Amino acid sequence: LDEDGIIDYSGYQRISARFKTDYQARKWLKVGINVGYTNSKTTSNPNIGTSGNSTNLSYYTNNIPPIYPIYVRTYNNGEIAIKTNETTGHPEYDYGTTGAAYTGYPGLSRPFSQTGNPLGTNRYNRSWSKGQQFNATATADIDFTSFLKMNITSNVNWGHSNGTSYDTMFEGPKQGVRGELGKSQNDVLRTNNTQTLTYTDTYADKHNVNVLVGHEYYKTETKYLYAY
């Protein structure tokens, strides 16, 4: 799977594989295994959120009045044009404030969502997440007699993810600190083991007896690291 997102500079890639089989080792013993693996990569933006503010691109574009510009404008050779940064050549986005950490140009501050311009941050800021997941389930069914049976099931689920977020040094809220880079790592290991013993029998063709005895053990280990 390799798809671009609805928003520019976003997308998702995934590779999955699965193997499943069972084997009748003996008349009284049947074993099986089910294994799955997934490798994925998500590309998005660290400033895209779901709250009602400028980090939400849909909210921002639907609610900002059209009189407010996306870019900083300049008057050049008798024409109004988009101003470009003299150092990088990038078009300069209007963040609705005169703060030095943003455009630093004199003028009026925007009353709607000052310091926000998700179109600008979406172009230069990035967020990557790479993940791996492994899941395996092994089973064993043992028939001691026609009425006494045992099932053993063990499951292992391992997940690993690496995250990277970058806020540009060229403009926006992280310009004043010369940009920001964040790294994260998350590891989760879950194990689950169950053993059940089932007794089923019928007496005098009238009375049915069904007894189930079981034991379950579950464990989760999580390790997380974040730095910027």
Please give the residue ranges for each predicted region.
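Transmembrane beta-strand segments that form the barrel wall of outer-membrane beta-barrel proteins
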Residues: L1-D2
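Surface-exposed loop/interface segments of Gram-negative outer-membrane beta-barrel transport/assembly proteins
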Residues: I6-I7, D22-Q133, N151-Y228
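Functionally critical loop-and-helix segments that line ligand-binding/catalytic clefts
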Residues: D143
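Transmembrane beta-barrel architecture of outer membranes
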Residues: Y12-R18
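An active-site-proximal structural segment forming one wall of the substrate-binding cleft
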Residues: L148
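A cytosolic small-molecule/anion-sensing beta-strand core signal
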Residues: A136
